[in-house]
Curated annotation (Swiss-Prot):
GO cellular component, one term: plasma membrane
Keyword Nucleotide-binding: yes
EC numbers on record: 2.7.1.130
Protein name: Tetraacyldisaccharide 4'-kinase
Described function: Transfers the gamma-phosphate of ATP to the 4'-position of a tetraacyldisaccharide 1-phosphate intermediate (termed DS-1-P) to form tetraacyldisaccharide 1,4'-bis-phosphate (lipid IVA).
UniProt-annotated binding residues for ATP: 53-60
Source taxon at top rank: Bacteria
Species lineage: Bacteria, Pseudomonadati, Pseudomonadota, Alphaproteobacteria, Hyphomicrobiales
EC supergroup of this enzyme: transferase
Assigned protein family: Belongs to the LpxK family.
Species per Swiss-Prot/TrEMBL record: Bartonella henselae (strain ATCC 49882 / DSM 28221 / CCUG 30454 / Houston 1)
Pathway: Glycolipid biosynthesis; lipid IV(A) biosynthesis; lipid IV(A) from (3R)-3-hydroxytetradecanoyl-[acyl-carrier-protein] and UDP-N-acetyl-alpha-D-glucosamine: step 6/6
Length: 339
């Protein structure tokens, strides 16, 4: 079962935050101890692309961007993923043609279009499997807080619209581990988008002496959007970014239906959405991640008026991925020489 992030996580003052504080303190204690562990080391350079909080921050397009640049530089990148939302057990090498979102999760299928992807709870074992496949660079999708694989560099992604939420640790807030602990172990922050919270986020990062980088998301669509009216539906961590994508392409959002993150739409769900759209003469709109999950449905042929929205990440710093990958390789060589 997949749950949506509670609204009070994104509010500074909340009775529920106060009520859940004792549980949060206990969770924070054990999460700090977990992050103090010495993770197993794989004989490959490892770049972790994670985030500070539970829920979506925009990691997936960032991982894809690094995979593309890595291939341009001559690497054979492999992505280590938890395969969240999937049901396969053990270590599984994702096959885009034969696997589906039910088995491996939507994010793993999206990533498999651009690189080898191995999913497993045991990230070290997944990295070893990718090494056997000929990969010479590991991109770790999430996993910063799990400490299941040594990383040469940790880049944490922050959604500017949400920031660090109310600043509390789960379940009182969205943080996976106290900020102080995470800041001490990460290497740099990638802030995606703009908001009133950007200055505060920049202040916190600069105070640690770590580097801060900026990026923006570019909206892409499978069909013409301008002037069309939409019934938008999605099961993602932050649907506000999806609605913003429609508006950026001059579309009009008339109705919205949001579901829990990684939600698998039933045929009844899709049938109802199609009927509501027809009733009000609306186009349907959803995200690329949601469409991955819809493709296993028998209702796919009835979604003729569906526009799929995807996102591309644009980095403010020129050659950002190239420069950071070079830093990863420098650290990897230093690690090997120190052994």
């Amino acid at each position: 079962m997949h749950l949506s992030a509670p609204h009070f996580w994104w509010k500074n003052k909340s009775f529920l935050r106060f009520l859940l504080a004792p549980i949060s303190w206990g969770y924070a204690y054990f999460s700090r101890r977990r992050m103090a562990r010495h993770p197993p080391i794989v004989d490959l350079p490892v770049l972790c692309i994670g985030n500070f909080t539970c829920g979506g921050a925009g990691k997936t397009p960032v991982v894809i961007a690094f995979a593309k640049v890595a291939k341009e530089l001559g690497f054979v990148p492999g992505v280590v993923s938890r395969g969240y939302g999937g049901r396969v057990k053990g270590i599984h090498l994702v096959n885009e043609e034969h696997d589906n979102a039910y088995d491996v999760g939507d994010e793993a299928l999206l990533l498999a279009r651009h690189a080898f992807v191995a999913i497993s709870v045991d990230r070290y074992a997944a990295a070893q499997r990718l090494k056997k496949e000929g990969c010479n660079l590991i991109l770790m999708d999430d996993g910063f807080q799990s400490r299941r694989l040594y990383m040469d560099y940790a880049l944490l992604v922050v959604d500017a619209m949400r920031g660090f939420g109310n600043g509390a640790v789960f379940p009182a807030g969205p943080l996976r581990v106290p900020l102080k602990t995470q800041f001490s172990l990460m290497d740099s922050v990638l802030l995606i988008g703009d908001s009133d919270a950007c200055d505060y986020i920049a202040f916190l990062v600069n105070r640690t002496g770590k580097s801060l980088h900026h990026a923006h998301l570019e909206s892409l669509a499978s069909d013409k959007v301008a002037g069309k009216s939409f019934l938008a539906f999605a099961g993602i961590g932050n649907p506000d970014k999806f609605l913003k994508s429609i508006k950026e392409l001059s579309g009009h959002v008339v109705q919205t239906y949001f579901y829990p993150d990684h939600y698998f739409f039933t045929n009844t769900d899709l049938k109802n959405l199609v009927q509501r759209a027809k009733m009000h003469n609306l186009w349907l709109a959803t995200t690329a991640k949601d469409y991955i999950r819809i493709q296993t449905s028998k209702m796919q042929e009835d979604l003729k008026n569906l526009v799929v929205f995807d996102i591309n990440v644009n980095f403010v710093q020129k050659n950002f991925c190239r420069v950071l990958l070079q830093e990863v390789m420098i650290r990897f060589r230093e690690r090997k020489h120190s052994l």
